[in-house]
Curated annotation (Swiss-Prot):
Gene: VPS34
Chain residue ranges for the region called Activation loop: 321-342
Gene Ontology biological-process annotations: phosphatidylinositol-mediated signaling; protein transport
UniProt xrefs under Pfam families: PI3_PI4_kinase
Name by which UniProt lists this protein: Probable phosphatidylinositol 3-kinase VPS34 homolog
Amino acid sequence: MEEWDGDVFTWNAGKEDIYTLIESILRLLKNGCKGMENMVVKYLGTGATDSLYMYFPWLRGRDLESRLSVEHQIDRFWKIRFELHEERTNSMDRYEDIVSSFLALDTKCGILGKLEGQMALVDEIRRIYSITSQGSPRKKRLREYRLHGTLCLHPGAGSMRLYASLFSLDATVKEIIFPEIEIFPSSTFPILVPLRTDRGVSRIIYKKGDDLTRDLFVLETIRYMSRLMGVDLVTYKVIPLSRKEGIVEVVDGIDFTRIRSRKDLEMYIEEDRDPRHQESFEKRKVFVSTLCGYSVACYVMGIGDRNPGNMMVTRDGKFFHIDFSHVFGRDPKPISSRITIARPIRDYLVNDELIYQDFLARSGEAFLQIRRSCRKIFVLWCILAQNRIFQFDLNEIIPFAQARLRMEMSEQRALELFEKEIRGAVGSLKTSVAHLINRVGMFLRR
């Protein structure tokens, strides 16, 4: 198999036993087979300058300059920094190659100044979080008192300073909006930090106590699944700083702790428009298609701890999930359903038979598309798993996904069982109980 060219690679990838294929891919990746990355990218159907290139371990320095944009080079910096921070990359040659690579990039596009500004912003956000966590209070209000009390006693803490944006390469952060910092009443009490930039206000979340490398793995997979399904699924960026710390990009939208009824949902995504209007129809269509896409993605990867706080919808009607701390069946709530449909969404679907049937049909189509393309997803996972930043065992996650996709059955039988699963998710008693428990927990932490 080491003699594959692009066409032979495609044929073997489609015909071989999945485990033989995985073993061959891993061997080729480990040996750094010349041109392997181009064959894999061609097989996966991704762009020539796709961010996937930064996950090939043997590509270094000049090999990456023409393949990655400046934005992806910065993403690569944070990945490499993580690996060095975790002391999992001990080769001095590797370190020198990294330094030389970024010095060359700095000459071309001034990348080091941007990185310095980003790191200064990270240090300031860490300082803010440390104020809220002094004494480790288990109440949101106590943490807020500490933060705003410090700002009152030391008004200079909120003084203006220029930083580089972490997620918008061309934006400059002019100010951290200290009075509007929020603390979430979840178990690790992450903070939401508003930033005033030269392009408007953006927001980021700082988390401590969560491993955001799982989120990164899931989001890379969802981006690829989005292409396979032909549905524009919302994703966002994350920067894991360590195994227990990281920063998350905030996508504008509203979560389902604030959408508590069908009427709330209709008002948000339809804006009180006449349902006969084309714009309203398109937004409903977008909502249903993205709901189906995310439902299938979360089902296949066994994403757990789904609650109203980590399900969101954008103003243009796109549904999406956030917070992927528990994946591949490792759900802290054993009573949870394998597909979670929040109550307002359930009521929205069953209120209109046409919308409900459209949801069932689109979910089935998305499931079949992922099932038919599962080999490509597994090849993507092989590439990601070669990076030290991720700690997933392919011998666990691939069989898990195969079981969810019911690869041992005929396509028709697998679809029938999935349709039964998705029908059961609408109005699931397990979901109602799990969400009630989550609300009680959040109330106790306020």
